[in-house]
UniProtKB/Swiss-Prot annotation:
<keyword id="KW-1003">Cell membrane</keyword>
<keyword id="KW-0547">Nucleotide-binding</keyword>
<dbReference type="InterPro" id="IPR003593">
    <property type="entry name" value="AAA+_ATPase"/>
</dbReference>
<dbReference type="Pfam" id="PF00005">
    <property type="entry name" value="ABC_tran"/>
</dbReference>
<keyword id="KW-0067">ATP-binding</keyword>
<dbReference type="InterPro" id="IPR003439">
    <property type="entry name" value="ABC_transporter-like_ATP-bd"/>
</dbReference>
<keyword id="KW-1278">Translocase</keyword>
<comment type="subunit">
    <text>The complex is composed of two ATP-binding proteins (PstB), two transmembrane proteins (PstC and PstA) and a solute-binding protein (PstS).</text>
</comment>
<feature type="binding site">
    <location>
        <begin position="46"/>
        <end position="53"/>
    </location>
    <ligand>
        <name>ATP</name>
    </ligand>
</feature>
<dbReference type="GO" id="GO:0016887">
    <property type="term" value="F:ATP hydrolysis activity"/>
</dbReference>
<dbReference type="GO" id="GO:0005524">
    <property type="term" value="F:ATP binding"/>
</dbReference>
<dbReference type="GO" id="GO:0005886">
    <property type="term" value="C:plasma membrane"/>
</dbReference>
<keyword id="KW-0472">Membrane</keyword>
<dbReference type="InterPro" id="IPR027417">
    <property type="entry name" value="P-loop_NTPase"/>
</dbReference>
<feature type="domain" description="ABC transporter">
    <location>
        <begin position="8"/>
        <end position="255"/>
    </location>
</feature>
<comment type="function">
    <text>Part of the ABC transporter complex PstSACB involved in phosphate import. Responsible for energy coupling to the transport system.</text>
</comment>
<protein>
    <recommendedName>
        <fullName>Phosphate import ATP-binding protein PstB 1</fullName>
        <ecNumber>7.3.2.1</ecNumber>
    </recommendedName>
</protein>
Length: 260
């Protein structure tokens, strides 16, 4: 298969065109143009305050929960501009799961954490819930570690286990997309490795967008990388190409550690 044919076959999940975002008078995202492709991992990198987390929170419109936010431009998700078209927010967030910087399990049992989303969206059948919980925990390689204590508190799990549980909770609603905002920044190296291995496995089923400060992590897990700086998308390219031959001097300076 030629490179050109492969590019044509790629399915765009998101197409961002000229998107701008303001917090009050502060112009936080400036004319962002970016495509995110199905069953790929897109890494969002850049120094603190560059707009990474703001950008990822626009993808499921969670950013609209922040006071005084104004958005303009196009954010096309599966062909619909969700900034302008009427969107069912509950349904949107069912299809776009999110995992945060630190594992944030609910103060409930392991089972109830994973079953929470399906219950909210109307699944009441006990057998069906059991099937969803088991599948979701297996998908994050946690089932064998917790199957004998599903009704104990999720807060009793280790940090790495809690983060995998939160990923399982996000997967339980059967989303298309998984957004991950620095999911390993609070974890030890062994737990980080498990999450990275999990990301590589999950991309066969899901489209993943991950914010990371870790250049090596971006290189290990992502197919394409987008470099943000001062609210601008400086460069977006195939990850191997970007790290070996960046087009913009600012990208080179950042990935080589001259600032950050």
């Amino acid at each position: 298969m030629s490179i050109a044919t492969e590019a044509v076959m790629k399915q765009e999940v998101y197409q961002v065109n000229g998107m701008n975002l303001w917090y009050g008078q502060h112009h936080a995202l400036k004319n962002i143009n970016l495509s995110i492709y199905e069953n790929e991992v897109t890494a969002i990198i850049g120094p603190s305050g560059c707009g990474k987390s703001t950008f990822i929170k626009t993808l499921n419109l969670m950013i609209q929960m922040t006071p005084n936010v104004k958005l303009a431009g196009e954010l096309n998700y599966n062909g619909s501009n969700i900034l302008k078209d009427k969107v069912d927010i509950v349904d949107l967030r069912k299809n776009i799961g999110m995992v945060f910087q630190k594992g944030n399990p609910f103060p409930q049992s392991i089972f109830d954490n994973v079953a929470y989303g399906p219950r909210v969206h109307g699944t009441k059948n006990k057998k069906k819930l059991q099937e969803i919980v088991e599948k979701s925990l297996k998908d994050v390689a946690l089932w064998d570690e917790v199957k004998d204590r599903l009704h104990t508190s999720a807060l009793s799990l280790s940090g790495g286990q809690q983060q995998r549980l939160c990923i399982a909770r996000a997967l339980a609603t059967n989303p298309d997309i998984l957004l991950m905002d620095e999911p390993t920044s609070a974890l030890d190296p062994i737990s980080t490795r498990k999450i990275e291995e999990l990301i590589l496995e999950l991309k066969d089923k899901y489209t993943i967008v991950i914010v990371t400060h870790n250049m090596q992590q971006a290189a290990r897990v992502s197919d394409q990388t987008a470099f943000f700086y001062m609210g601008e998308l400086v460069e977006c390219d195939n990850t191997n190409k970007m790290f070996s031959n960046p087009k913009d001097q600012r990208t080179l300076d950042y990935i080589s550690g001259k600032f950050g």
